[in-house]
Amino acid sequence: MHLMEFPREVILGKNLIQEINNVIKRLKLGSPGLVVYGPITKKIAGSNVEKIVKEEFEVYSITVKEAHINEVERVISKIRDKGIKWAIAVGGGSIIDVTKLASFKMGIPFISFPTTASHDGIASANASIKGLNVKTSIKAKPPIAVIADIDVIKTAPKRYLAAGVGDIVSNITAVRDWKLAHKLKGEYFSEYAASLSLMSAKMVIRDAEIIRLGQDEGIRKVVKALISSGVAMSIAGSSRPASGAEHLFSHALDMLLDKPALHGEQTGIGTIIMAYLHGINWKKIRDTLKIVGAPTTAYELGIDPEIIIEALTIAHTIRPERYTILGKEGITREAAEKAAKITGVI
């Protein structure tokens, strides 16, 4: 059996905080609800969301500091104690991922209200949570609705939108890896999911100059592409259409660094290197990232070149069952250094 789950509603536009109660009514979610935000996203939109929802529904709130299993447990306790029927995540990747996993474990729906367009977790079923004995993302359920308010997303530093582009272009190498696993390992491959994923990447490459401006049109394009990536993963029933060796590289960096860069910044650089290994046009990917203002070198990422090389050599161990261009044995230090140098990453 192949189960596909998607958001029931995706709303993209301006001044959407006013629309939240209509979404809750249309989806018949009832009361009480839970607003989940971070210390910063509370100020950006969380308090406003809470105030609007309170006008028509009973609602509680909780502040989440990081994407850690302890925070997930705190949210679960709140859901249990207050008999919460649904949750709304107001924030970036961490807040959305914590809410996603907590609501999944408690069997309640959640609404995704992103404050940044920095990665494809805003509409996907996957959550990246620290403190578990898994090194990568875990599968939960996608949001029942996504409400992407351009006015809110626009207030985030441009760095976040550029990181979103980094996460989307990584679909190019992810699909290559997936095809490779299909050919060499007989892994299930969905032409439809792969096409949707690649289309998202092609669109942001084509519209990089518009995205660079950080205005409404560019934000709209990135958000649409991120949501399409999430839907592609739902169709595939796995993160395969949007996560390959470049994501393993990013997870390796997360393990090696005390303070990693943004997820999309790391996957963007990973994509340049993996595209080189695949023998495809890595310069086009690098140029796109440069146009939107995303980092393309270790120096711009603020990461020691030595760490880049190490991450490349250990990336294959992160998810041994996920076959990629790195192969089962990984790549040698020499090959890693050569790839990083040729692509100008180090």
Curated annotation (Swiss-Prot):
Residues the record lists as binding NAD(+): 93-97, 115-118, 124
Comment on bound cofactor: Binds 1 zinc ion per subunit.
GO molecular function term, any single one: glycerol-1-phosphate dehydrogenase (NAD+) activity
Gene: egsA
Functional description taken from the UniProt entry: Catalyzes the NAD(P)H-dependent reduction of dihydroxyacetonephosphate (DHAP or glycerone phosphate) to glycerol 1-phosphate (G1P). The G1P thus generated is used as the glycerophosphate backbone of phospholipids in the cellular membranes of Archaea.
Protein name, entry field: Glycerol-1-phosphate dehydrogenase [NAD(P)+]
GO-annotated biological processes: glycerophospholipid metabolic process; phospholipid biosynthetic process
Catalyzed reactions per annotation: sn-glycerol 1-phosphate + NAD(+) = dihydroxyacetone phosphate + NADH + H(+); sn-glycerol 1-phosphate + NADP(+) = dihydroxyacetone phosphate + NADPH + H(+)
InterPro entries: G1P_dehydrogenase_arc, G1PDH, Glycerol_DH
Stated family: Belongs to the glycerol-1-phosphate dehydrogenase family.
Protein's pathway: Membrane lipid metabolism; glycerophospholipid metabolism
Signal sequence segment: none
Positions bound to Zn(2+): 167, 247, 263
UniProt superkingdom: Archaea
Enzyme Commission (EC) number: 1.1.1.261
Gene source species: Pyrococcus horikoshii (strain ATCC 700860 / DSM 12428 / JCM 9974 / NBRC 100139 / OT-3)
